[in-house]
Amino acid sequence: MASSNLIKQLQERGLVAQVTDEEALAERLAQGPIALYCGFDPTADSLHLGHLVPLLCLKRFQEMGHKPIALVGGATGLIGDPSFKAAERKLNTEDTVQEWVDKIRKQVAPFLDFDCGENSAIAANNYDWFGNMNVLTFLRDIGKHFSVNQMINKEAVKQRLNRDDQGISFTEFSYNLLQGYDFACLNELHGVALQIGGSDQWGNITSGIDLTRRLHQNQVFGLTVPLITKADGTKFGKTEGGAVWLDPKKTSPYKFYQFWINTADADVYRFLKFFTFMDIEEINALEEEDKNSGKAPRAQYVLADLVTRLVHCEDGLAAAKRITASLFNGTLSDLSEADFEQLAQDGVPMVEMEKGADLMQALVDSELQPSRGQARKTIASNAITINGEKQADPEYTFVDGDRLYGRYTLLRRGKKNYCLICWK
C-alpha cells in the first residue's frame, strides 16, 4: 500500500473523524516519510482502551515508513485538559504526575519500534520545554498569538462556559495554549508535520496548527480518530468494574481477553477495523463466513486473540486462553499460580477466608448462596463443584488438598457462577 493512500485506508477502516486539508496532507505523504505525533497526558497510572486507537494509528504510520513521536505530557498532565469535561479536574502533585509519566512511557514503548533506522520512534515529554519556561516568556511568546474570542468559541470549552454550576479556571483555560505550543515545538525540534488524536482534541490540534504557522511559517496538519461508541449506545471501554486498562496489574490479561470475547455482533467487525491490523478484505470475508455458518460467530475470538496479543504479548494471550478453557471445561490442572493470581485480581468474584471454614459457610460468604439452609439444599442437589470436582456432602470441610498452591480454591454453583477462595 502506497503511503499516499494511507489516509484513504484509514478512512476505509472508519478511523478518520476529521482531517485538515486532506488533499494537501495526501500530497505531503506522497512526497515521502513525515514525522507525526500523538500526545498522552498522564491523568492516571495507566493508559486505557480509549488510548489504544490513536496509539495504534501511530503504529500504522510507522509501518508505512513514517516517524512517530509519542509525547507524554509531563507538563500538560499537571494542568488538565478541560475539553468536553463536565467539571474541573483534580490537580495531582508533581511527584505523582512524574511517576505516571514513567509508567505511561514504558506502556507505549512496545507498540512502536525505537530502533529501525530513520523512522525510529521517539518518546518525548513536554515538561522538557515547559519546565523552565517563565510566565513572561509564556505570555509574550505564546499567549500573544491566541485570541480569547476564538478560544471561548471552541466547542470543547464552550459547554463548560455555558454551565451555571461549573465555570472554567484560568489554569484549564490555558491548556489549549500548552498543547498548541507542543505542536510548534515538535515541528521545530523534529520537523513534525502531523498531529493525531481523539476527536475531542480537534480544538487543541487546530490551535497548534495556527501557532506553528505563526511561529515557523510551516504548513502542518491534524487528523483525529473517532471516539469509539457501541451500537447499543453504552460507553465503550467500560465494564462493571470500571475502565479497561492496558496495565496488566489494573486489568488482568484474562479480564482484558474476556472484554473482547463479549463484544456484541453489531460491533465486532467494526472493532476489528479499529483495533487490529487485519486487511479489510479479511474482515469482510470473516463477516460473510460468520453470517453463513449457522454457528456462533468466530469474529469475537479473532478480535480477542489479536488485541490481547498486541497489548499483552504471546504469554499474556496464552494465559488468558488457558484460564478461559479451564473455567469452561472445569479442569484446573493446567493453571499456574500466576493464573490464579489473575483470577483473584479481577477474573471472578473473590473472598478471603480463614482455614477451618466449611463448604456451607464458604457458599454464604462468597454470596453464591443467601443462607446456610439454602447452601445445604444446593450442595445436596449436586450443584456445587470444588476445583472442578462435584461435592454433594453438606457437612464437607475443606482440606489442604483443596488449597491449590496452598492458597486457592475455586467454587462453582451450576454452570457459570464462580467464586475464588483465597485462604488467609
From Swiss-Prot:
Enzyme Commission designation: 6.1.1.1
Domain (S4 RNA-binding) ranges: 357-414
Catalytic activity: tRNA(Tyr) + L-tyrosine + ATP = L-tyrosyl-tRNA(Tyr) + AMP + diphosphate + H(+)
InterPro entries: aa-tRNA-synth_I_CS, aa-tRNA-synth_Ic, Rossmann-like_a/b/a_fold, S4_RNA-bd, S4_RNA-bd_sf, SYY-like_C, Tyr-tRNA-ligase, Tyr-tRNA-ligase_bac-type
Residue positions binding L-tyrosine: Y37, Y175, Q179
Keywords assigned: Aminoacyl-tRNA synthetase, ATP-binding, Cytoplasm, Ligase, Nucleotide-binding, Protein biosynthesis, RNA-binding
Motif mapping: 'HIGH' region: 42-51
Pfam families given in the database record: SYY_C-terminal, tRNA-synt_1b
GO cellular component: cytosol
Coiled coil, from the record: none
Motif 'KMSKS' region location, chain numbering: 235-239
GO function term, MF aspect, one: tyrosine-tRNA ligase activity
Function: Catalyzes the attachment of tyrosine to tRNA(Tyr) in a two-step reaction: tyrosine is first activated by ATP to form Tyr-AMP and then transferred to the acceptor end of tRNA(Tyr).
The protein, known as: Tyrosine--tRNA ligase
Species: Enterobacter sp. (strain 638)
Source taxonomy: Bacteria, Pseudomonadati, Pseudomonadota, Gammaproteobacteria, Enterobacterales
